[in-house]
Amino acid sequence: MFGKGGMGNLMKQAQMMQEKMAKMQEEIARMEVTGESGAGLVKVTMTGTHNVRKVEIDPSLLEDDKELLEDLVAAACNDAARRVEENQKTKMAEVTGGMQLPPGMKMPF
């Protein structure tokens, strides 16, 4: 069915892919991105595992209304999360050689 050495090669490829995935997961966990809102007045730094590391708020916003500040912090968090997702997709494409996964399917499985 797999031919001479076909199954062995397939297993080797699967193992190499698994090793690349583990390395990619470690890189993503160490990665940090910064999301911004209000033209950089609010910045949120987040890890590749979506943990917020730091929130920076321009002092001028502390004098404005509370609701505006809350909206800007939420927007910066969402921007950081979007950037994490983009970086994860880029890393995944490096590992899978650009192979597209079906919609909704996330790796590692």
Swiss-Prot record:
GO molecular function terms attached to this record: DNA binding
Keywords noted in UniProt: Cytoplasm, DNA-binding
Main localization of the protein described in the UniProt heading: cytoplasm
Keyword Plastid set for record: no
Gene Ontology cellular-component annotations: bacterial nucleoid; cytosol
Compartment list: Cytoplasm, Nucleoid
Pfam families in the cross-refs: YbaB_DNA_bd
Its job: Binds to DNA and alters its conformation. May be involved in regulation of gene expression, nucleoid organization and DNA protection.
Family indicated by similarity: Belongs to the YbaB/EbfC family.
Complex formation: Homodimer.
Protein name: Nucleoid-associated protein Sama_1311
Species in which this protein is naturally found: Shewanella amazonensis (strain ATCC BAA-1098 / SB2B)
Organism lineage: Bacteria, Pseudomonadati, Pseudomonadota, Gammaproteobacteria, Alteromonadales
